[in-house]
């Protein structure tokens, strides 16, 4: 009996452990609305951040129906340390340290969409690039420093550290090519990323990603180039 219990616990442990193989040419698929399906990403750097860039692809048909979380980075002091969120009828919401700015767009995302969001504390300049095109730069949380030891979640919006999810904020669709740097990429570098290049991500590296899956999330070949 004890041996059977040990085997069961071992299988459960392996089913929930970090994937060490990376996600090259793959994507996470969230097939239905939920408040318990998500992916937790393990950061390579665990330190306060004075700047960052996050780039990723996402694909969903929710954009005309409701809002949804694209990227959620929480610390114990601030659950919206970084939040990328699509707000229906408004556009892209970009939050740092709990403060929010809106990037209005004329085209609603219906195809696989590439996003890059960058921010730096020294100037407070926040940038959002959509499919290789820059939005107008805006000011956000100048002088702020992001806390360390983050909980990084795909598929849900964290309303507390690592939890408090809501179905109506969940992503239904695909997300992939999530990379993060601890500095603001230049326009030339972002264009290179959009064209398929890379610049050795040092916070999150999709090719060497470690993560934990919870709930109904599947790993499938990516649907974008």
Curated annotation (Swiss-Prot):
Q: Where in the cell is it found?
A: Secreted
Q: Which GO terms describe its biological process?
A: acute-phase response; innate immune response; regulation of interleukin-8 production
Q: Which GO terms describe its molecular function?
A: complement component C1q complex binding; low-density lipoprotein particle binding; metal ion binding
Is Glycoprotein among the key words of this record? no
The region annotated as signal peptide is: 1-20
Q: Which residues bind Ca(2+) 1?
A: 80, 158-159
The domain of life for this entry's organism is Eukaryota
- The SS bond pairs are 55-116
Major site of localization recorded for this protein? secreted
Tissue note: Found in plasma.
Pentraxin (PTX) domain sequence ranges? 24-225
Subunit structure of this chain's protein: Homopentamer. Pentraxin (or pentaxin) have a discoid arrangement of 5 non-covalently bound subunits. Interacts with FCN1; may regulate monocyte activation by FCN1.
Additional remark text: Asp-61, Arg-76, Arg-77, and Glu-81 may be involved in the calcium-dependent binding of phosphorylcholine, a property that may be important for the biological function of this protein.
The name on file for this protein is C-reactive protein
Q: Which organism is it from?
A: Oryctolagus cuniculus (Rabbit)
